[in-house]
Amino acid sequence: MIRSPKAPTTPRLALWLWLIALVLLPTARAAEHSLYVDLGVEQQKTSWLFLVEPGLSIQTRPFALRLAAPLRFDMEDRFHLWSRDWDALSDAGRVLRELSLRVHDGAFRLFLGNLTHTTFGHGTLVQGFIASLDPDAMPLGANARLQLGPVALEAMVSDVFGPEIFGGNLSLEPVSLFGPTYDRLHLTGTFVADPTAPGDAREDGTRGDSSWVILYGVGLDWAVVRTERWQIAPYFDANFNGRGYGFHAGLLADVVFRPLKLSLRAEWRWAQAPYAPDYFDLAYAIERRDFWAAGELPISQAEAVAAIDWAHSGKVELRAESGPLSATAVLAAMGQDLFNASVVVNAVAGDFELSVFGALRHFEFGHNPDRALGLAEARYRFLDYFYTWLSAGQLYRLDESGRASALFTWSTGVGVAFLLNPPPEPNR
């Protein structure tokens, strides 16, 4: 992440956000106000941190607001405040966890917070994008969507305070423009850019020059079959990146066997470097952070794209939902026997919640990947107001010489949460 020179203003911005929320609290006609406090410990490499985080949630019909005041203290440095939490203006995302607005039955939607699993259109340019996987950085991003009859506009920026990834998507129902509503056929256009994208590393392995990366494309999909249980929709995308280009032809199928819902995607791809399918994906933030960090770099996206003879490749994605359980698995061929794979699982069983996320990047079957990432969090609620949690993350990577490095972090603690406006007890 690019560290902003305006970092000293970050604590003041956090204070102003909390003051505004406290002023709005008595006037908001909320369905639910809640307050929580977390206490815990965290380990990053050899550093031990003590966590204190109070938070406030306001839920209303038009908007939702979640604020936090996360404080981490270095247990090996006289419990001084962990400076990395407040060394950039973009760390405002630590305070404003969510500000969402929904008006006119969802015709306009706005979200401010840390962007996670963001996808545009068919996901051939922006697929599952996560703004930050750095435990010391939580940028404040924005995503907005406007629906005007048969036209839908969507825009996103990964960090409102920094020159990072931004883009937009336009979806159009062309038949509906000239007659009755027909929402089976869609035309899409997508534009995404990163003004300071990672470039090639120098010969000594250190950071090279950055450059603009601009990707754009058009797409078409048509739901040829749509019933209560089935939906089948072929699609086609044509995308461009400088001298590079790519074509995507795929099939989306949704099947409902209550309470189970399955979604399957099968996609054929043909690409010419420097274009790469799913360029802004779940691992892009890792590469970006590595690029701006000092020292030797792992294999960069730009170099990997240039080295792969893309030609023909494919992708398979499966999603399953059944009540409190959901899972998504993706396997994508990258050319030259290289693959990307990821899996996401969310489960709820009574007072217990579990979330698991894993990804392998640029791997051959039977060989180590260039990068591997695993995240997991478990949460258990007890005694009505109390809960405990355990979270852990592992990042593994290879540099150009084949040397491996790993970053492991974990945290655990307890918290208490209670309603500020509990519902009245029913009359007996």
Can you name each region flagged by the protein language model?
Residues 49-75:
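Glycine- and aromatic-enriched membrane insertion/assembly motifs of diderm outer-membrane
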Residues 32-34, 47, 59, 64, ...:
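Signature for the C-terminal beta-barrel architecture of outer-membrane proteins
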Residues 14-24:
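Bacterial N-terminal signal peptides
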Residues 1-10:
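N-terminal secretory signal peptides that target proteins for export/translocation
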Residues 99, 170, 406-428:
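Outer-membrane beta-barrel "beta-signal"
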Residues 110-119, 156:
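Mobile, glycine-rich extracellular loop/lid and propeptide segments
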Residues 65-98, 125:
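Surface-exposed loop and membrane-interface regions of Gram-negative outer-membrane beta-barrel proteins
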Residues 30-55:
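Short glycine/proline- and aromatic-enriched beta-strand/turn motifs that initiate or cap beta-hairpins
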